[in-house]
């Protein structure tokens, strides 16, 4: 009986990415390389919700990794209707969702709208040293970034970061960060179509990606330093991947080397979870951090699935994937590696 208890996880959580729902017929993606199943993405979400509800160990929460509805909804002004349809399905599960924001959130809505919507799950995070999307008097602050952290269990923490902190699509034109982002993008990408990586040495500098500002990097440093001191295991979560071996290089955070440097310098970091690259990829970097990019629901054929449940143990996390998401056993960083600073 004791051994059985020892095998039980500390907690579990669900993961789903790039639902990109729209009430539209199937069509090819931007690059014409794969089919997008717009209506079926809602069916895929329903299947995930039903399975999570039936699991013997109920997930403590669900990570929704961004791009919850597709930007195509703006063509017939159906963004709010599409979002409501998705949220209705999510609300059928009596479990909290933690949302990150991707490029399609910003195709459909302003940052201010998102801040006041159900896609702002900051209130579910710790109130100490949070990234914040509001000023001290409670008013919306467009210069802030959407990021927070929470601890579902002692010795474990999740840090959600804003990959579109520096981005022309993630900021209003009146924002100083908009000008900084646009100037940087045009400096790196001379193409007329800023979504095109043609001829670029740094192919991540396209409009559908974004960057992490110095202020957010400083905030991440503070949170991770605190977690180092507490000897916590930290999962960092974002829409955009940060490791070239865990995604198509065209899908990375603009300043991914800076972000990686921060993550790899903190022994508390055990994993980085992302979406955006719909085919999904995985790697473990030289510091023992697991970089897991989840397959996108939107490009998952109707006969398959694309979601997973992570089981968290003292020394490892075990992913039970469905369909395109593979099962994986991911051990935490070796104590010797943890002691080495970047």
From Swiss-Prot:
Keywords for this protein: Hydrolase, Metal-binding, Zinc
Matching SUPFAM superfamilies: Metallo-dependent phosphatases
Example GO molecular function: CDP-glycerol diphosphatase activity
InterPro entries registered for this protein in UniProt: Calcineurin-like_PHP_ApaH, Metallo-depent_PP-like, MPP_ADPRM
Keyword Metal-binding: yes
Binding positions for Zn(2+) 1 per the UniProt entry: 18, 20, 67, 278
EC number assigned by the record: 3.6.1.13, 3.6.1.16, 3.6.1.53
Reaction equation(s) it catalyzes: CDP-choline + H2O = phosphocholine + CMP + 2 H(+); ADP-D-ribose + H2O = D-ribose 5-phosphate + AMP + 2 H(+); CDP-glycerol + H2O = sn-glycerol 3-phosphate + CMP + 2 H(+)
Cofactor or coenzyme needed: Mg(2+)
Broad enzyme group: hydrolase
Residues annotated as binding Zn(2+) 2: 67, 103, 239, 276
Membership in a protein family: Belongs to the ADPRibase-Mn family.
Complex formation: Monomer.
Function: Hydrolyzes ADP-ribose, IDP-ribose, CDP-glycerol, CDP-choline and CDP-ethanolamine, but not other non-reducing ADP-sugars or CDP-glucose.
Name this polypeptide is given: Manganese-dependent ADP-ribose/CDP-alcohol diphosphatase
């Amino acid at each position: 009986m004791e051994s059985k208890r020892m095998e039980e996880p500390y907690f579990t959580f669900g993961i789903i990415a790039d639902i990109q729902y729209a009430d539209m017929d199937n069509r090819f993606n931007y690059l014409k390389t794969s089919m997008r199943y717009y209506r079926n993405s809602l069916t895929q979400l329903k299947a995930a919700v039903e399975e999570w509800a039936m699991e013997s160990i109920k997930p403590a929460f669900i990570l929704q990794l961004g791009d919850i509805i597709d930007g195509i909804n703006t063509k017939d002004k159906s963004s709010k209707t599409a979002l409501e349809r998705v949220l209705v399905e999510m609300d059928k599960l009596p479990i909290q969702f933690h949302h990150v924001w991707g490029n399609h959130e910003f195709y459909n809505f302003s940052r201010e709208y998102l801040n006041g919507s159900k896609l702002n799950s900051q209130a579910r995070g710790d109130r100490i040293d949070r990234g914040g999307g509001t000023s001290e008097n409670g008013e919306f602050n467009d210069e802030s970034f959407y990021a927070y952290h929470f601890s579902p269990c002692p010795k474990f923490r999740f840090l959600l970061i804003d990959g579109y902190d520096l981005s022309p699509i993630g900021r209003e034109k009146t924002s100083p960060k908009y000008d900084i982002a646009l100037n940087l993008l045009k400096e790196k990408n001379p193409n007329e179509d800023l979504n095109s990586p043609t001829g670029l040495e740094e192919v991540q500098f396209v409009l559908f990606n974004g960057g992490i500002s110095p202020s957010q990097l400083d905030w991440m440093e503070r949170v991770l330093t605190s977690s180092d001191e507490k000897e916590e295991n930290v999962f960092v979560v974002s829409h955009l991947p940060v490791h070239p071996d865990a995604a198509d290089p065209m899908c990375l955070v603009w300043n991914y080397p800076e972000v990686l440097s921060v993550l790899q310098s903190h022994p508390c970091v055990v994993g980085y979870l992302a979406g955006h690259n719909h085919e999904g990829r995985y790697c473990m970097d030289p510091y023992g951090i697991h970089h897991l990019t989840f397959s996108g629901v939107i490009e998952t054929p109707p006969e398959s699935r694309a979601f997973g449940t992570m089981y968290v143990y003292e020394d490892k996390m075990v992913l039970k994937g469905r369909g395109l998401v593979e099962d994986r056993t991911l051990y935490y960083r070796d104590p010797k590696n943890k002691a080495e600073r970047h």
